């Protein structure tokens, strides 16, 4: 390719960047392709036109183009290797089919080699020598017009792509081939004697070896048209001569390339026709069956299709039936409940029944059967509740003082349970509260006079009129006067029945007999006998005085007897304890006397003073000591007088009484 006619738009962005960097052209880091193309036209193309720097610029451009071509070839070989590895794992083909595929590969490789050899034979000898000396240099396109160079490169790439497509088709084709394909007619191609000798060698080696796709891809990549650049720096005259030679070569090669392309298209058409024939033959063989097997196969397929069609229908039918059963299990109880509720209301209480409507419809005789079945479940009439006034449709009105009550299970009238009459608890509570207030007032009034013991009824009690005025003015605001009057009548009746309430009419005879009231407006006086609110002082004065007068004599006698018994008991206890102490002291005194008698180193006697001090040292009271010693001495002399010798001893002018134990 002539670098002066190079179109930078055909290059990639990475290639343009590399060319600009190698030619020391600065550009922005985020520059896009139009900016890079503009810089190439302004900077690099000027250097191509100048003679001293043209070789360097061409060298950089050739490196970039060659690296791009190598990358493209490497990608193609990798793709072919991947396709071959995937196809080799999935293939299980017979020996006959393997041989046909080998022959097909041989034909494609020979066609490709022939085409490449034709182009090499037409190239000058000088370039072949340069290829042998420097095979690693990037190819240089022959100098020609822009349109001719693009056409030749496009033809070569299209031919290589057709060959690769044929290889891919063979590797991905899993259909066995019955007939061998005809070999391409190589004599139609114009080749040299050297190329024919090389081709025969490769065909001989292909008969013994099994080509894989990796070898095929390397062979295809190795057969390329490579153009070499000059070894050293060339002058302007040499470049012009070289470009003229390359133009002549391209003009000579073009007809040969066209012929090779036509041959390749013919070969691909023959391959396609042969594949179609093979597939049609195989399908015809597979379809040829015996009439019995064909009918069995037809019947089996038909039954299978029928089962496949019936399966979803049966599943949908089962789902529909299941949903229908659930719907009926819900709707039937609801309809029966609505019918029963209507019948219950229509029947109502006994003596107030209403005529029932029949469910039978003349147009549908089946409804008569349903109506006859439901008549067995028709409810019976209910008895009217106590203290109630019944009417139709289960309506109830209660007597005065009672109110209608509904059942807990009625659920706001959805289920028609009968009502009953109960006492009006609100009125009863109001009456009870008013009775309690009046009773407490009378108790306090009674406790305020003579500690509840007064005999004057007007001081300890209250008249009916005054009680009415007091509690009428203190009634709650929401209670009317009429309601209070009704409640007051009940309050007076309840007060008269209480045990701690005394009530007397104001117009009574002196002898205590009550006169018959001349009118219904007789006024009464009420008094409470309860002492609940009497003070503590009144309780003490009255109760204690009463107890003393009633139980005083017997109480004093009881206390005297108890005191006497206690005194006697204490005296006896003291006597017993004194006797026990004296017995103990007597025994200790005798033991002391015996010990002194036995001890020969000392005097064999003890004075009464020594003996008293030894025995009564624990008792601090002198009076008690004297008392105990006197009793002890008296008891010793009375019981042990025969065993004790008593004599007087004078010492230092004092006379002492001495006791000595006789053995």
Curated annotation (Swiss-Prot):
Biased composition (Polar residues): 47-62
Ranges that cross the membrane: 317-337
Single GO molecular function: chromatin binding
Places the protein is found: Nucleus inner membrane
GO biological process annotation, one example: nuclear membrane organization
Keywords per UniProt: Membrane, Nucleus, Phosphoprotein, Transmembrane, Transmembrane helix
Pfam families found in the cross-reference section: HeH, MSC
Bias (Basic residues) ranges: 124-134
GO cellular component: nuclear envelope; nuclear inner membrane; nuclear periphery
Assembly with partners or alone: Interacts with SRP1.
Cross-referenced PANTHER family: INNER NUCLEAR MEMBRANE PROTEIN HEH2-RELATED, LEM DOMAIN-CONTAINING PROTEIN 2
Name used for this protein in its record: Inner nuclear membrane protein HEH2
